[in-house]
């Protein structure tokens, strides 16, 4: 397995409205959605999602994988320690980020310098 598709980049934002104005109005990013609380704003840059958050780390790099459980197990077999197993992050009932009814799953880990990285995947909600 090779992690070669950036799915999302998370960046700290001290003021969400100021961030919306800057990224949408000045940089031309497509605004996706604002969740406040908890203090999240999402944009799309040609297929790469950018998350601005008021209470997160300075930056997090998310890698898209087709099968998060397999990718998680493969990286664990290479000695990577995860902060937690894959977990449900968002149930997309309205289709804000993809098809309605899909779930977004993530598993977070760190690089040797302590930078936060994540695996990300979507799957249909189990019925």
What are these regions (language model features)?
Residues 69-74:
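Short amphipathic alpha-helices within nucleic acid-binding modules
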Residues 7, 38, 104-105:
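Short loop/turn microsegments at loop-to-beta-strand junctions
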Residues 19-24, 75, 114:
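Conserved active-site tyrosine of GNAT-family acetyltransferases
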Residues 28-34, 82-85:
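Short secondary-structure junctions
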């Amino acid at each position: 397995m090779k992690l070669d598709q950036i799915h999302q980049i998370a960046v700290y934002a001290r003021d969400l409205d100021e961030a919306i104005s800057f990224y949408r109005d000045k940089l031309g990013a497509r605004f996706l959605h604002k969740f406040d609380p908890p203090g999240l704003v999402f944009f799309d840059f040609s297929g790469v999602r950018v998350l601005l958050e008021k209470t997160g780390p300075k930056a997090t790099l998310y890698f898209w994988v087709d099968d998060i459980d397999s990718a998680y197990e493969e990286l664990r077999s290479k000695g990577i320690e995860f902060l937690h197993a894959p977990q449900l992050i968002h149930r997309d009932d309205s289709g804000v980020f993809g098809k309605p009814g899909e779930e977004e799953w993530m598993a977070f880990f760190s690089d040797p310098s302590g930078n936060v990285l994540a695996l990300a995947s979507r799957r249909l909600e189990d019925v």
